[in-house]
Amino acid sequence: MAIKMRLQRFGVHKRPFYRVVASESKNARDGKFLEILGTYDTILDIVELDHNKAQKWLSNGAQPTKTVKKVFKKSKFVAKNKTKFEK
């Protein structure tokens, strides 16, 4: 099963708020997830990310989406070992 690190949309109309989650790639965007890794507020540009959890999922083979890679850069997340994320 392929694990993706992606965003789940929350909030109200024209006021989105996202959770960074690890979920199976077959699940819907706002569907079932395995673990919450952090939050991202696009309006206030605030990123709260648990770096230890993100590192754990990357080392287990989870693939971040393009948007989650950008969120990682905003939160100054650096992977400890070489993973596919850095390539």
Curated annotation (Swiss-Prot):
Protein name, entry field: Small ribosomal subunit protein bS16
SUPFAM superfamilies named among the record's database cross-references: Ribosomal protein S16
One biological process term in Gene Ontology: translation
GO CC list: cytoplasm; small ribosomal subunit
Organism lineage string: Bacteria, Bacillati, Mycoplasmatota, Mollicutes, Acholeplasmatales
Family matches, as InterPro entries: Ribosomal_bS16, Ribosomal_bS16_dom_sf
NCBIfam families: S16
One example GO MF annotation: structural constituent of ribosome
Coiled-coil annotated spans: none
Similarity remark: Belongs to the bacterial ribosomal protein bS16 family.
Record's keyword terms, sorted: Ribonucleoprotein, Ribosomal protein
